[in-house]
């Protein structure tokens, strides 16, 4: 099978000899991959890994799978084959994958020496997104979406509405990360928010906050291209290089709706200066959320910045099935706009060219490159497919506008009868 595979730190390469995945458990299905996004985690695995992947010569704790493995965990595709225990999905369905591998998935690998190992405390309590042995399909547990096909259990697959193109469907996983952060902080509609960092997660948080009824969103981002994109997606923007750190915080607090800081802040950058800004830009009793993945190093901040104003600081890790379902529902209802979501995609590349044409580009051109998605199955038809899908979306929008107009006319007629 063709794949862009991880062989170890600094060693990602294309192969056409990766082992073909097969159904083992009765509730598994085979997915023909259409698109799979590149995540910051994939870049860190290349430059600083292994993080979720096992060391070369070792196996993953959950699955006992070794390297090499196909990378990629932001995947969408079409069901190709179903096991005898699959109940709700059928061949031909468009699906997106929740790629977590946790204690509850051990049954899928009956030959693993850990198949009967006791579940960790978090999994026992239902918080599988913070499993002590957390791994990902495409990052350690098993091969992922930078390959032609993936096998996954049905409970990790969600049907995508027919009108959602599969390139946009590949954004559902990162959007679920953002949605989970909003759930974790118990976001209240009508509140205000500051997002620090306009990478894919920061931009996705704009979409999630809009869908959740946020009254005002400000994004702090130094890169011009990313600020422009954040504006297109409905946020006010600020360039933090315009002022020194203290002046930036004072300015951001002043432009919050109300003039005294934000109800919620979301740190999508993961730096000491952004953590402190996330806390200090809050109004009293506000909540700061960390979505960034940090290295294992210590930083300085003042606990009294939290205590004196009864602020809260919390982390958000991955997602659960609730978040995937909520994002898909928001797409169905139009609360997440497909065209706005598609702004996040700045490149489409075949997996053969994935290392130089995508991964290295994201590492070396990160200010102007946001989200690149890979395909194993489109073979040079990237631009044509994207153009066709844009036409489909425009036609869908036109039909919806016509329906709304007809409804308005009918309502007006009823009022005058």
What do these predicted ranges mean?
Residues 292-310, 327:
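Rossmann-fold NAD(P)-binding glycine/threonine-rich loop
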Residues 191, 286-287:
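Glycine-centered, small-residue-biased loops immediately flanking beta-strands
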Residues 282-284:
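Helix-to-beta-strand junctions that scaffold the AdoMet/dcAdoMet cofactor pocket
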Residues 61-68, 73, 102-196:
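NAD(P)H dinucleotide-binding glycine-rich loop of Rossmann-like/cofactor-binding domains
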Residues 276-280, 321-417:
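C-terminal hydrophobic helical "lid"/dimerization subdomain
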Residues 21-36, 51-119, 161-163:
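Glycine-rich beta-strand-centered segment in the early N-terminal region that forms part
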Residues 202-203:
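N-terminal Rossmann-fold NAD(P) dinucleotide-binding loop
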Residues 192-198, 210-277:
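Adenosine-nucleotide cofactor-binding segment
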């Amino acid at each position: 099978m063709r794949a862009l595979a991880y062989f170890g730190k600094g060693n990602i390469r294309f192969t056409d000899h990766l082992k073909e995945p097969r159904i083992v458990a009765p509730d598994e299905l085979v997915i023909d991959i259409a698109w799979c996004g590149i995540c910051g985690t994939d870049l860190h695995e290349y430059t600083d890994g292994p993080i979720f992947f096992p060391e070369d010569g070792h196996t993953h704790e959950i699955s006992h799978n070794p390297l090499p493995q196909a990378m990629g965990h932001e995947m969408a595709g079409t069901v190709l084959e179903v096991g005898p225990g699959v109940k709700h999905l059928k061949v031909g369905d468009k699906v997106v994958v929740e790629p977590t591998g946790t204690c509850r998935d051990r049954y899928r690998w009956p030959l693993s020496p850990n198949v009967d190992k006791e579940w960790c405390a978090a999994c026992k309590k239902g918080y599988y997104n913070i499993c002590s042995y957390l791994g990902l399909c495409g990052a350690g547990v098993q091969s992922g979406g930078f390959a032609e096909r993936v096998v996954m259990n049905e409970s990790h697959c969600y049907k995508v509405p027919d009108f959602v193109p599969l390139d946009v469907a590949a954004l559902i996983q990162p959007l679920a990360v953002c949605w989970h952060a909003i759930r974790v902080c118990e976001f209240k509609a009508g509140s205000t928010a500051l997002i620090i960092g306009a990478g894919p997660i920061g931009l996705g948080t704009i979409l999630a906050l809009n869908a959740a009824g946020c009254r005002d969103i400000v994004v702090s981002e130094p890169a011009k291209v990313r600020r422009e994109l954040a504006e297109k997606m409905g946020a006010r923007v600020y360039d933090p290089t315009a002022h020194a750190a203290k002046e930036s915080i004072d300015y951001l607090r002043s432009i919050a709706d109300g003039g005294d800081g934000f109800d919620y802040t979301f740190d999508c950058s993961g730096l000491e200066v952004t953590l402190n800004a996330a806390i200090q830009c809050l109004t009293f009793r506000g909540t700061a959320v960390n979505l960034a993945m940090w290295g294992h190093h210590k930083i300085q901040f003042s606990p009294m910045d939290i205590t004196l104003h009864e602020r809260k600081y919390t982390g958000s890790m991955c997602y659960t099935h609730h978040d995937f379902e909520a994002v898909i529902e928001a797409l169905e209802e139009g609360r997440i706009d497909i065209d706005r979501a598609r702004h996040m995609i700045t490149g489409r590349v075949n997996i053969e060219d994935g290392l130089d044409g995508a991964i290295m580009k994201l590492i070396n051109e990160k200010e102007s490159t946001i989200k690149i998605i890979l395909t194993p199955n489109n073979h040079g038809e990237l631009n044509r497919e994207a153009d066709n899908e844009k036409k489909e979306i425009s036609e869908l929008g036109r039909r919806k506008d016509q329906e709304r107009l007809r409804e308005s006319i009918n309502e007006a007629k009823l009022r005058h009868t």
